[in-house]
Amino acid sequence: MLPARCARLLTPHLLLVLVQLSPARGHRTTGPRFLISDRDPQCNLHCSRTQPKPICASDGRSYESMCEYQRAKCRDPTLGVVHRGRCKDAGQSKCRLERAQALEQAKKPQEAVFVPECGEDGSFTQVQCHTYTGYCWCVTPDGKPISGSSVQNKTPVCSGSVTDKPLSQGNSGRKDDGSKPTPTMETQPVFDGDEITAPTLWIKHLVIKDSKLNNTNIRNSEKVYSCDQERQSALEEAQQNPREGIVIPECAPGGLYKPVQCHQSTGYCWCVLVDTGRPLPGTSTRYVMPSCESDARAKTTEADDPFKDRELPGCPEGKKMEFITSLLDALTTDMVQAINSAAPTGGGRFSEPDPSHTLEERVVHWYFSQLDSNSSNDINKREMKPFKRYVKKKAKPKKCARRFTDYCDLNKDKVISLPELKGCLGVSKEGRLV
């Protein structure tokens, strides 16, 4: 299982947490493979004559032999070995087992492992966070991330009851075992029937603030507000919603942000661009002040961005940024879920990411590799079909999804290159949504 939401990585070593962001070619996990797994001969191994050598697996069960473990793993590819021998506590919960396994992995040098948080009863807490990436997200009772719930530099609001209205994303509105309700992501405020989910604190704050100023019109969320304005907005929001753990920006003279920002209730701190407040990927720390540049600013490359003023056909005015933000957030959550679903002891490893890449760039590289099934370095017409379905399902407003692939195809050659995908998703070298 795995995470998503709060701040981000610092050193190249810590970047290894995103080793799994971009699956190695030739190691793709597909739905059909799981569907036919029961017909695999390994799934029906006869283990009665094998020598008993107990194995404790990640599902909390003790398997009497490697044969029995392989048979179970055939049916559940995410299954991993915790240790040789029987599980010490046969009644230990899945969360506690995964936590123990992760803590063991974390002892290895250069490993930035996600360690799940468990409740007193051994169940997964509704909110899970990754210390090094700074992402937090909502999970189901069995620890699976809820699509679209990942956020950064803020704790997500996860409801503990099943909503009457089924959610459009995944199965997050369904009971898992008939006894525990599946938590859902509360995305408030909701405007014009569209959920607003954003991967960054500043986008969400701008949308919330604009909605309060004008209930019928959301202003252009690309506008950058001064730190003083953001601070005042956050203070007002915190006063109205004291239990939501709002981040209150710390300001410097002239409307700038202080280079270090912290979230008091979680203990996380991170570096920001002093002119926009944008968190810098890779700088998140907990209970320790990060070392930040005193005058890091956004680079003015917008004039060279061909997508900046490019019209997205059919998308309501002022909604393009909101649409792209929600799409990138969904991709980030799904990437994290892909990392979680990879068996720790499995043979397939994800390729190591470029240390110079921002998190947003890694998300785009990861998704591009998923789509580029023939490794041609572009997304052709056939490969574009799942992309279209994904955009239509995950991103909002829906009207913006209809012509999005045409919008991405900048040179109109009927294929989408990696630079084009980066551009239409608003990901610059600095990792900002441009």
Swiss-Prot record:
Q: Which positions fall inside the EF-hand domain?
A: 359-394, 396-431
Q: What are the disulfide bonds?
A: C43-C74, C47-C67, C56-C87, C95-C118, C129-C136, C138-C158, C227-C251, C262-C269, C271-C292
The name this protein carries in UniProt is SPARC-related modular calcium-binding protein 1
Using the UniProt annotation, give the residues that carry a glycan (glycosylation sites). Answer: N214, N374
Compositional bias, Polar residues, is annotated for 149-172
The GO molecular function terms of this record are: calcium ion binding; extracellular matrix binding; heparin binding
Which purpose does this protein serve, as stated in its record? Plays essential roles in both eye and limb development. Probable regulator of osteoblast differentiation.
Upper classification of the organism: Eukaryota, Metazoa, Chordata, Craniata, Vertebrata
Per the record, its GO cellular-component terms are:
basement membrane; extracellular space
**Residues that hold Ca(2+) 2 according to the record:** D409, N411, D413, E420
Region (Disordered) residue spans: 149-191
Report whether Calcium shows up as a keyword of the record.
yes
Q: Which residues form the Thyroglobulin type-1 domain?
A: 92-158, 224-292
For Ca(2+) 1, which residues are the binding ones?
D372, N374, S376, D378, E383
